[in-house]
Amino acid sequence: MRKTVRKNKQVKRELALLEKEKEEIESFTKVSKTVENKQSINSNWNVTKEKIKNKNNAYQKKKEAKLKLKSATPYTSTKVIEEKKPHIKDFNQLCQEHNIISPIDDNLVSPTQKEIDNLNESSKFFSIDCKIIEIEGNKGTLGKVCIANQNGQIIYEKIVKPMDKIVDFRTKFTGLTRDKVQREGTDFLQVQKEVEKILRHKILVGHDLVHDLKNLKLAHKKKLLRDATQFTKFFNPDTNSEDSLKSIAKRELNFSPDNWDPNGKRDTIINVILYKQNQKEWEAFINNKFYGQPIDKN
């Protein structure tokens, strides 16, 4: 019995030793694998470091070569500086550049009634400019009207005798005087009738047309109006709002005379040039505004 107990104890001790040896072997195996992995990582990192080093060396050589070339070659700018054209000062020059033959003089253009009857069909669009004088009640009224056809030809220009008493001829802005109005003026109602007949159902180009039509006491379909104050391309770039005809002409046509005197013929023709130069984009703008069609700038 005692021999059997001793045998069992000895077997247990041997089993315990075997278990311990097994654990030591497993532990050693894990350590070996870890070392192998580290060696593999270190090997990859060394390869990467070598590649980076080679790239840096190549970059440094290129940089040094460029510096040598730069020091050996005198500096010359490759940037092309666009020279600004001098502003056009002479209105006749502007007309010539845009193939418009329309003499600017002080003579009014008063077509006969028969000619007026045929003017509407003679042009696809008309340009208009109105000069406003002041009457009693601190109100504005029509003092002069000028109309040009699609070719920039002045077809109608008349001074208007208002129905109310004139308080201020606003000569600085209209060029009108008491003598001119009394001597050359035509009754307002006659001018209104003639202008309506000329413009009926036609595209109308101008600057601040709402104001002009108000003083003419005429209605015109909004979709037929080409008002430079409403065309966003002509907005003042600093304020993003409507701009004066003088500023638009300077920016769009490079036209900037030394003296911008009140001249209805000049302003009317400028409106024709502006419209013809931007017609495709302007019509696309109107199409989008009234019909909701996308603007095609191509």
Curated annotation (Swiss-Prot):
Listed InterPro entries: Exonuclease_RNaseT/DNA_pol3, REXO1/3/4-like, RNaseH-like_sf, RNaseH_sf
Residues in Exonuclease domain copies: 125-275
UniProt cross-references to SUPFAM superfamilies, sorted A to Z: Ribonuclease H-like
SMART domains: EXOIII
Coiled-coil ranges from the UniProt annotation: 1-73
Localization per record: Nucleus
Keyword terms: Coiled coil, Hydrolase, Nuclease, Nucleus
Keyword Isomerase in annotation: no
Single GO BP term: rRNA 3'-end processing
EC number(s) recorded for this UniProt protein: 3.1.-.-
GO cellular component, one term: nucleus
Molecular function GO labels: exonuclease activity; nucleic acid binding
Family of the protein in this entry: Belongs to the REXO4 family.
Descriptive protein name: RNA exonuclease 4
